[in-house]
Amino acid sequence: MPYATARSGDVMSSAAPPCCTSLLGLSLSMFVAPGTLTAAPLDAPVVNAPAPTPPTPDLAYPELFQAVQRGELFDDQKHFVDFLPLRDPALINADYLAQHDHPGFDLRKFVDANFEESPPVQTDAIRQDTALREHIDLLWPKLVRSQNHVPPHSSLLALPHPYVVPGGRFREVYYWDSYFTMLGLVKSGETTLSRQMLDNFAYLIDTYGHIPNGNRTYYLSRSQPPFFSYMVELQAGVEGEAVYQRYLPQLQKEYAYWMQGSDDLQPGQAARHVVRLADGSVLNRYWDERDTPRPEAWLHDTRTAAEVTDRPAAEVYRDLRAGAESGWDYTSRWLADGQNLRTIRTTAILPIDLNSLLYHLERTLALACAQPGAECTRDYAALAQQRKQAIDAHLWNTAGYYADYDWQTRTLSNQVTAAALYPLFAGLASDDHAKRTASTVRKTLLRPGGLATTAVKTGQQWDEPNGWAPLQWVAVDGLRRYGEDALARTIGERFLAQVQALFAREHKLVEKYGLETDAAGGGGGEYALQDGFGWTNGVTLMLLNLYPGKDTKAAPAKRVRKPEAAAR
């Protein structure tokens, strides 16, 4: 498996990354004991060695895997990788190789005989006479999973505590989704479940050295937008500021993962998630340890790479994987020509949202280190200030908004996207920059159904005309932090009306919404529209409490010192 393909300027190790080493035959009994949150040394300089895991499906039974995915045996490429092998995958693959050329061989029957299917999450059994808030409260139990042990050869990773899945095809927990889900759990009074989800993420950090995209073997080679510090902040709002010190070891490991390799970079070089610019400042990008097709989207990726003639397929695969790590899979933000997926160059982009989240992580670490008894040798407040200065220098467009920066071509994007509001959400924007960004967003991205993701139509799901619950909340919360209450209310109420209209018609909440007046679910992407839906449920509850209707009673929020307050 190739791991060392890199763009010009990337500094790569010749060794296979530890999270992706193939360890055939190892079972989940070799996991760290569920429920144990190991106390890592403070200011751990390197990421801990990850726990051994079974190989991903594309490595465990490669020939069978490719036959199923290439043959489009299932409409959704993710479906097969979630199947449970009923015996040793190597034996299944050997039997496939011995039988597949025989006359009358039936691939579907072979799969059915050797795998157990994982059904989608069902949420349609809820009463049809419920109001929106009650419906969400009834949804939570249907979205809860408890998997502190999984069968051998499963692609699922065990977690010590119950957790909430998004719904539909998403039968596992997802990193950045979960923050917005946890907001709703707290509003619903499900504070124990919210705490358990936080502890699961701390466990993942302790076990694998980072929080993977989701709790599947095929997600271990990457992470997702780093919201762990926001989860800790949310829990501090429930329990008090001692929470910051409790999760300090995991916050430090999370930071070490995202910053790994930064100390050794020369100007103009990149390694993993970090890039050192010509002026010496360090900013981050999205990345994936592997440069092969994603198992859960194998055919999509191979077809995309086949369209590219001017660079290696491995480079395309890594950029597709990095795009998946971004959460925005996919969007014009990552496309060189702004339209075609084959021009994807995610690893060349320094995203404004990612760097805002890491600023919040640095501020949270500074706050945790200030707690009585904490011992920290790094000045995280200074690191946050350095990042803020780098963002202002490289990610601020003087036309009046924050944008992404291409570190290879040294060009700042002129595209206005919903990500421009992340610096407000993280509390790093100056008052002037916040005001100008709000004005630009109002003119460019405001739609009848809320905040548009971008103003570009590409057919990708993270572009016009779709609206996503997490981006609505980032916008509303960020704008309110800077006194832009009117625009925040407009965005929040418009999106809430869209959610309510679709709910009134179909009695469900969905993953994404079209923002025109017909109150439809969103389109585009590699799979059908999903309902459930974790982060929409959470954001809807937050908006209902901010902008209550006739049957909604808003409870006053408990105030906690936030890590960005010292930086304003």
Curated annotation (Swiss-Prot):
GO terms for cellular component: periplasmic space. Transmembrane segments: none annotated. One of its GO terms (biological process) is trehalose catabolic process. Substrate binds at residues 169, 176-177, 213, 222-224, 294-296, 327, 526. GO terms for molecular function: alpha,alpha-trehalase activity. Keywords: Glycosidase, Hydrolase, Periplasm, Signal. Provides the cells with the ability to utilize trehalose at high osmolarity by splitting it into glucose molecules that can subsequently be taken up by the phosphotransferase-mediated uptake system. Belongs to the glycosyl hydrolase 37 family. This is Periplasmic trehalase. It comes from Xanthomonas axonopodis pv. citri (strain 306).
